[in-house]
Amino acid sequence: DKMHVDRETFEGISLEEMLRRMDAANIERVFLVAAKVGVKHHPACYHVPYDLVAEAVRRYPHRFSALAGLDPTEGMDGVRALERAVKEHGFIGAHFYPHWFELPPDHAKWYPFYAKCVELDIPVQLQVGQSLVYDPTYPRRSVGRPIALDAVACDFPELKLIGIHVGIPWTDEMIAMAWKHRNVFIVSDAHSPKYWPQSFVRYIDSYGQDK
């Protein structure tokens, strides 16, 4: 309810319906995320199979690009799966939600994935800012403070880090990280522009236009 997603969309639509909606909105291409939302064994969590997203991209390569979700509890098995997704299925980046695992972006369990992203020359995008209570049986702490990207950007200067969801309510921290580090960027998704903090509006209207 908080995300204002209609039931049909939440339960899943066909690729053809998605393309119809994209055309209606004049959207040429989108990312399809093989999201890993929490640990597999919990009923409130789910993993979108890499193969499912890879098949959609195979069918409509000019409309979809694939991002590989990350689960830090998978360890090196997850790192190897990421490599296969990129090398065998053409995934163009990695994606993760820190709060679903209650591990901030600078936690050591994410570092093998960062190293592999550098090796594969792909970016990683991650949610920054607060988390919601998506399921009452699985409340998660908000561990996505943008300041946590500081250590990651210092330790992996070759890694392109993309903070999604603007960083609200710590938007100024996200701006500071993008200003400090040439390899840190902000994505203005999730929140309608009318709700963007004024500091973010000023940032993208001025010295943050290329970040």
Place the predicted regions along the sequence by residue.
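An N-terminally biased module of ancient metal coordination in phosphate/nucleic-acid-related enzymes
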Residues: 1-35, 40-44
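Alpha-helix capping and helix-coil boundary motifs
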Residues: 2, 10-14, 41-45, 75-77, ...
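Short N-terminal micro-motifs specific to bacterial/archaeal maturation
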Residues: 6-9, 44, 69, 101, ...
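Short, acidic/polar
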Residues: 12-22, 74-85, 171
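Well-ordered, non-membrane alpha-helical segments in soluble/globular domains
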Residues: 14-16, 46-51, 145-148
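A generic secondary-structure signal
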Residues: 17-25, 55-59, 84-88, 151-152, ...
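Active-site gating/metal-coordination segments in enzymes
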Residues: 28-133, 137-140
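Catalytic pocket-lining loop regions of alpha/beta-barrel enzymes
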Residues: 91-93, 103-211
